[in-house]
Amino acid sequence: MSSSHTVDLNSSQLASARRLIWPTAAVIFLFTVSYPANDFAPPPSPPDIGLGMLLVYAAIAAVTGGVVFAWVLPWALRQESSGGVALALAVLGTLLAPAFWAGFPPALAAGGALLGWAGIHARKGRSLSRAAFGIGVLGVHFNVASYAAVFI
């Protein structure tokens, strides 16, 4: 006797994406804040920015991360198709990667990539989700490369 059951890949992917929202948000926040923190506290020289400016950068990163990961992604994951939203986030995060220091491109790119990944097996908007995933991953890489270029 054999038993077979089907696995809904879309439901599994959505559940995984929901579990990854907060860890992704935390990593993106720490990455975004690490740049001004590095300017604030280099040991051998006086800081380039003051505590107030560091807190402004942290606030921008927190608000952007909050909007993307606490509001947009949970809302979009409840929709039948979230490919368009994912693509918009991914494209913005990728195009704005050279301005990663502004505090919001990393969250946009990562949010677009995560949302795109969540919709790869969706019944509707699958192509947009796949494009968003690819562009979002590229955007995250561009943000990291832009960050690294500052220190090389």
Predicted segments, located by residue:
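Membrane-associated alpha-helix detector
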Residues: 2-97
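Polar low-complexity intrinsically disordered regions enriched in Ser/Thr and small residues
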Residues: 55, 119-122, 142
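A broadly tuned preference for mixed-charge, low-complexity surface segments
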Residues: 78-82, 125-127, 147
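Central hydrophobic cores of alpha-helical transmembrane segments
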Residues: 85-91, 113, 130-139
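Membrane-helix boundary connector in multi-pass membrane proteins
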Residues: 97-131
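Juxtamembrane boundary at the C-terminal end of a transmembrane helix
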Residues: 141-152
